């Protein structure tokens, strides 16, 4: 099994090296930059998008439904194999397989953000929905390329490095979503043109991201194509024994290795029962956080906080604490093992949502608002780093984009598609935010039960990196 062999071959010197020294690795700078790029689209179609629609007078249910365009993130596994196999004319030849696809996707996000600045939800929501869907499609494609870039840059043969990469990419993601998002909120509340000016600002940030990707990031080295060619040759040989015509056998072999082999390899390596359990855990783990996160900004506004207060607390302070907690979470998860990290952070993530229930009962209180954001950021950082490391270690180096995209898509399913009903739920609860956040608290329970049930099989698969017998 490729992942097991990689872990078994992990360099010994890393174990004796202080974890913080791993962050001096230049590769982590590249990963942070791409993490920032991955998080940026959520500055456009996340909280800013929800509050923009709320300011335009749309109902909570409508905001939740419009936000469901983000379900495209849960579908990117459908075209992820193309990023492993298809070479874009000129782009991939000039910049490499990973960077070529990333640049194309980033150009799409930039164009979509400019278009968003020209739309008006008070005139009609159809154009808004189409532009948002275009942005999300570009962002979802970018995510596939970025995740593959990260795993190929620091592979499973460097388990501590991969854990550090998970922390850095998560810190970059929150920086990309938080800092530009805070700037957008501030501009929307103070600058002439309001949200249109804010979206123009976000388009400028995206343009800078494209320039950095273009000029400074190297293409990762990988023997992916050689392994894929071997798999394709085996399929052609099997087809030749059945006397399949040469041209047809070439097409069938290419399709098999592109669309079927990544998933067949994953099931063969883990077994069908464990595969289904892993995907079930991934879907369920962050569903409570997804429901809460979709409506958080709307909740802040309804409670009476201004755009500037949201930008200061949820944006700037939230970004600083989240980035710090992400790096700390990397250290904690390496010392405790991914299993304990997922289990403890899952419980803490649920309890943090109770703070929002209290906040709903107390009313607009800046101190409580700040405490809620810090508590939520700590648990989110802890769980996100463990979660990213978990699915990274499960990913084959041969089919990086395809396999990671499937698992990430399952996680995005709860964050996007299932959470589309969050606004409807608040409406059905007669606007009771306290009850809504209480319900999100208990949503994580099924995933933790499932994780406990499959822990032994995962330990056999991943070893000490997943479940340390003694936390260090």
Task: Describe every region a protein language model picked out.
Residues 13-73, 274-281, 285-299, 303, ...:
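Helix-loop boundary and gating motifs at the non-cytosolic
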Residues 340-390:
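C-terminal transmembrane helical hairpin of 12-TM major facilitator-type secondary transporters
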Residues 72-79, 312-335, 345, 349-352:
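Transmembrane alpha-helices of Major Facilitator/SLC transporters
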Residues 76-95, 188, 324-341, 426-427:
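Helix-to-loop junctions at the C-terminal end of transmembrane segments
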Residues 394-428:
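A late C-terminal transmembrane helix in Major Facilitator Superfamily
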Residues 84-87, 117-119, 177-197, 330-331, ...:
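Transmembrane alpha-helix termini and helix-breaking/packing motifs in multi-pass membrane transporters
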Residues 1-25, 117-130, 153-291, 305-307, ...:
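Intracellular loop-helix junctions on the cytosolic face of multi-pass helical membrane proteins
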Residues 100-123, 347-364:
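C-terminal ends and interior cores of transmembrane alpha-helices
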């Amino acid at each position: 099994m490729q992942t097991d062999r990689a872990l078994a071959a992990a360099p010994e010197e890393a174990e004796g090296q202080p974890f913080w020294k791993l962050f001096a690795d230049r590769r982590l700078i590249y990963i942070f930059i791409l993490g920032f790029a991955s998080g940026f689209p959520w500055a456009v179609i996340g909280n800013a998008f929800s509050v923009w629609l709320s300011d335009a007078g749309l109902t909570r249910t409508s905001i939740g439904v419009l936000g469901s365009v983000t379900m495209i993130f849960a579908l990117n596994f459908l075209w992820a194999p193309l990023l492993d196999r298809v070479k874009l004319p000129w782009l991939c030849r000039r910049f490499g397989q990973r960077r070529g696809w990333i640049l194309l996707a980033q150009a799409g996000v930039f164009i979509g953000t400019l278009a968003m600045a020209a739309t008006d939800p008070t005139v009609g929501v159809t154009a808004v929905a189409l532009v948002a869907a275009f942005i999300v499609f570009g962002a979802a494609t970018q995510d596939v390329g970025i995740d593959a870039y990260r795993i190929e840059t620091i592979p499973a043969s460097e388990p501590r490095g991969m854990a550090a990469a998970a922390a850095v990419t998560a810190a970059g993601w929150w920086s990309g979503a938080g800092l530009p998002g805070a700037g957008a909120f501030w501009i929307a509340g103070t600058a002439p043109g309001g949200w249109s000016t804010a979206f123009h600002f976000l388009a400028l940030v995206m343009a800078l991201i494209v320039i950095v990707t273009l000029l400074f990031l190297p293409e990762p080295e990988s023997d992916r194509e050689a392994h894929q060619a071997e798999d394709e040759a085996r399929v052609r040989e099997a087809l030749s024994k059945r006397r399949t015509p040469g041209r047809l056998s070439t097409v069938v072999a290419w399709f098999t290795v592109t669309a079927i082999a990544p998933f067949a390899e994953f099931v063969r390596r883990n077994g069908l029962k464990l595969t289904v359990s892993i995907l079930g855990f991934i879907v369920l783990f962050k569903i409570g956080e997804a429901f809460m996160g979709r409506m958080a900004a709307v909740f802040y506004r309804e409670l009476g906080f201004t755009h500037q207060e949201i930008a200061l607390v949820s944006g700037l302070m939230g970004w600083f604490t989240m980035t710090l907690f992400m790096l700390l979470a990397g250290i904690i998860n390496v010392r405790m093992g991914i299993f304990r990290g997922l289990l403890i952070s899952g419980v803490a993530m649920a309890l943090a949502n109770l703070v929002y229930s209290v906040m709903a009962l107390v009313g607009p209180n800046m101190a409580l608002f700040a405490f809620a954001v810090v508590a939520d950021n700590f648990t989110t950082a802890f769980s996100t780093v463990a979660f990213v490391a978990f699915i990274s270690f499960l990913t084959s180096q041969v089919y990086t984009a395809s396999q990671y995209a499937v698992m990430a898509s399952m996680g995005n399913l709860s964050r996007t598609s299932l959470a589309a009903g969050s606004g409807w739920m608040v409406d059905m609860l007669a606007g009771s935010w306290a009850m809504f956040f209480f319900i999100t608290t208990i949503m994580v329970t099924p995933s933790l039960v499932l994780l406990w049930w499959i822990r032994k099989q995962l330990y056999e698969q991943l070893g000490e990196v997943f479940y340390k017998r003694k936390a260090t």
